[in-house]
Amino acid sequence: MAAKDVKFGDSARKRMVAGVNTLADAVKVTLGPKGRNVVLDKSFGAPTVTKDGVSVAKEIELKDKFENMGAQMVKEVASKTNDEAGDGTTTATVLAQAILNEGLKSVAAGMNPMDLKRGIDKAVIAAVKEIKNISRPCEDSKSIAQVGTISANSDERIGNIIAEAMEKVGKEGVITVEEGSGLEDELDVVEGMQFDRGYLSAYFVNNQDSMSAELEDPFILLVDKKISNIREMLPVLEAVAKSSKPLLVISEDLEGEALATLVVNNMRGIVKVAAVKAPGFGDRRKEMLQDIAILTGGTVISEEVGLNLEGATLDDLGTAKRVVVTKENTTIIDGAGAKSDIEARVAQIRRQIEETSSDYDREKLQERVAKLAGGVAVIKVGAATEVEMKEKKARVEDALHSTRAAVEEGVVPGGGVALVRALQAVSDLAGDNADQDVGINLLRRAMEAPLRQIVANAGGEPSVVVDKVRQGEGAFGYNAGTEAYGDMLEMGILDPAKVTRTALQSAASIAGLMITTECMVSDLPEDDKKGGMPDMGGMGGMGGMGGMM
């Protein structure tokens, strides 16, 4: 085992706080409407320009191991806030830096670190309660657009496009962000269920303009196996032909004789048909087939439950108002499934979301909920250059997370005002001893830090602004964008309550751990010579060569 470098007390904390300050100083320049950009060098391609706190934090690694430990712990604050609320990473970093710096001053003055931490924890509980009290629901499109605008660094177009997307697909609907091909942002909305499987043969296409197979009021056959023998399909195919309705076949795969027969029937006009592979893989495919069955009021023909294709009747088939199959996607619009069955299925998937520990599984389950409950909206981000495209896409994703958080827990006045208003609840607190009181007071000072930083980035005088905001009431605050005082809610400067709450809780949690740190252990720096080849010495003289001719 390698030898370790161990540091104690003040010398450890000084190195740790130096790392914290390096990272926090890089992140906090991005805060507020007049925050600056940070340029990140990449090992390949053009540098990335960003105003996203967590993107900046993730890039920072420090050479000194003890400083790096401090930086990594603050990085954890930004990441945790981003994972939970989707935004507020810069605010959380500024808060953590302020709490830590204030806390270490108190520790140096002889306070008990554990009591300081208890005081901070008490104050956080009171502040979070007050943030919840001053929040108000965010339900109308205008509020959603305002939250999106603020999170996207005051870009109104992004706020409006997110509000429009949420209006069209509902609060539960899936909204995805993609890189567009033009200069303008676009919004595509897909109603009904869409999955990423296209037609198995181009001969199914019946709309040459859009190169798609469009089926009006079709039957939908769902089969959980590979179909290659047409004999199995004949009974159900004949029944569909008699009904004169189109047919969509969704199966694990369809090949050989079975596919050829369907193509011939379609081209001769005997049965209007299209075939696609089932979405997903393995167990997820089985679940998604079941989702489609519930949405369309059909039954999955699966040998696992004793059903076979030869015995299938029209009663086993689902129906929908319309189906559109392109080369890459299949969209089922207005399935005929019972609303109560769909709601029960959605509730079942939501329970699975709560129980799963895998982020990937959770994301896939949420997609399934959205496909059953609402539609799918795609925001295509437009920009002039690749660098701008990446920066803008990151801002749109941030804004989308923020609006979801706002819908979940409501909104509070933005621009650091909510934390200043929550100070009142903290002011009335008393600790069990003098050191806890110091912890409560240091959190009070730290809660002003985001507002101070917003004003500083805008070129204002932080102390003057904080004093004036503190004297005001309710949503009264300072708009750094226009350098005017007024009602933050009326000016449309809103923050999701969840973002403000998570930022404060994450920052206090990590800063509390750092304040109570007494010892740090790290690997010793490696000696550059270590591992090289040993010195081979000179080769010496070659001596007389004798009489070479």
UniProtKB/Swiss-Prot annotation:
ATP binds at T30, L31, G32, P33, K51, D87, G88, T89, T90, T91, G415, D495. Its EC number is 5.6.1.7. This is Chaperonin GroEL. Keywords: ATP-binding, Chaperone, Cytoplasm, Isomerase, Nucleotide-binding. It catalyses: ATP + H2O + a folded polypeptide = ADP + phosphate + an unfolded polypeptide. InterPro entries: Chaperonin_Cpn60_CS, Cpn60/GroEL, Cpn60/GroEL/TCP-1, GroEL-like_apical_dom_sf, GROEL-like_equatorial_sf, TCP-1-like_intermed_sf. GO terms for cellular component: cytoplasm. GO terms for molecular function: ATP binding; ATP-dependent protein folding chaperone; isomerase activity; unfolded protein binding. It comes from Hahella chejuensis (strain KCTC 2396). Pfam families: Cpn60_TCP1 (PF00118).
